[in-house]
């Protein structure tokens, strides 16, 4: 497997750390006035999902993680597993709760997701950046209730709760940014 020098660290790079595949979230090269240069990184462990900060000397190198990112279509959830299909080979893969994690609330049938595999097993699921979901429960917006810039909580078909503007009603379909969990717009 390839090795990466700490000078090659970039956001999104997958490396092995303590026997577990990790993804670099951000890296900063620091060259102090006195002493050796180093790289300060924020890393997410792909299996456990833990965030950690680690400092590497400029001469350090680490092994690249043998992980594969695949674009797959989300099919359905049977209660224990979320099932995905490769559109080219029609091969199906099942991801458990540990792999889907927080992204389960953004999975919409027939949406293209990124499944990260390590040793042939799914370890993380990345939903599309934007999803369109229907509102199943929210407080009614009263006419003239526009004081303030706040919103109201709305429950979506997947169970996710998003803060929406006061004019949005039950039954409407909205567009949500899955990276931040924020309301983007109404869908016509």
Swiss-Prot record:
Free-text description of this protein's post-translational modifications in UniProt: May be beta-lysylated on the epsilon-amino group of Lys-34 by the combined action of EpmA and EpmB, and then hydroxylated on the C5 position of the same residue by EpmC (if this protein is present). Lysylation is critical for the stimulatory effect of EF-P on peptide-bond formation. The lysylation moiety may extend toward the peptidyltransferase center and stabilize the terminal 3-CCA end of the tRNA. Hydroxylation of the C5 position on Lys-34 may allow additional potential stabilizing hydrogen-bond interactions with the P-tRNA.
Location within or outside the cell: Cytoplasm
Pathway(s) annotated for this protein in UniProt: Protein biosynthesis; polypeptide chain elongation
GO MF entries: translation elongation factor activity
Modified residues (N6-(3,6-diaminohexanoyl)-5-hydroxylysine): 34
Keyword DNA-binding: no
InterPro entries assigned: Elong-fact-P_C, NA-bd_OB-fold, Rib_uL2_dom2, Transl_elong_fac_P/YeiP, Transl_elong_KOW-like, Transl_elong_P/YeiP_cen, Transl_elong_P/YeiP_CS, Transl_elongation_fac_P
NCBIfam families to which the protein is assigned, alphabetical: efp, PRK00529.1
Family designation: Belongs to the elongation factor P family.
PANTHER family, A to Z: ELONGATION FACTOR P, ELONGATION FACTOR P (EF-P) FAMILY PROTEIN
HAMAP family: EF_P
Biological role: Involved in peptide bond synthesis. Alleviates ribosome stalling that occurs when 3 or more consecutive Pro residues or the sequence PPG is present in a protein, possibly by augmenting the peptidyl transferase activity of the ribosome. Modification of Lys-34 is required for alleviation.
Protein name (database record): Elongation factor P
Organism: Hamiltonella defensa subsp. Acyrthosiphon pisum (strain 5AT)
């Amino acid at each position: 497997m390839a090795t990466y020098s700490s000078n090659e660290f970039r956001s999104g790079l997958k490396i092995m750390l303590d026997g577990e595949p990790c993804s670099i979230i951000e890296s900063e090269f620091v060259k102090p006035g006195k002493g050796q240069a180093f790289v300060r990184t924020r890393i997410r462990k792909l299996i456990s999902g833990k965030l950690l900060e680690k400092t590497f000397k400029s001469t350090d190198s680490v092994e690249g993680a043998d992980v594969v990112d695949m674009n797959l279509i989300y099919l359905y959830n049977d209660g224990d597993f979320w099932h995905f299909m490769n559109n080219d080979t029609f091969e199906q893969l099942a991801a458990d709760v540990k792999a889907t994690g927080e992204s389960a609330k953004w999975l919409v049938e027939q949406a293209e997701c990124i499944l990260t595999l390590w040793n042939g097993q799914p370890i993380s699921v990345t939903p599309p950046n934007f999803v369109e979901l229907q509102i199943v429960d929210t407080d009614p917006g009263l006419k003239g209730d526009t004081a303030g810039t706040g919103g109201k909580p709305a429950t979506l078909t997947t169970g996710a709760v998003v803060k929406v503007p006061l004019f949005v009603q039950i039954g409407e379909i909205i567009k949500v940014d899955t990276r931040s969990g924020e309301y983007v717009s109404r869908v016509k």
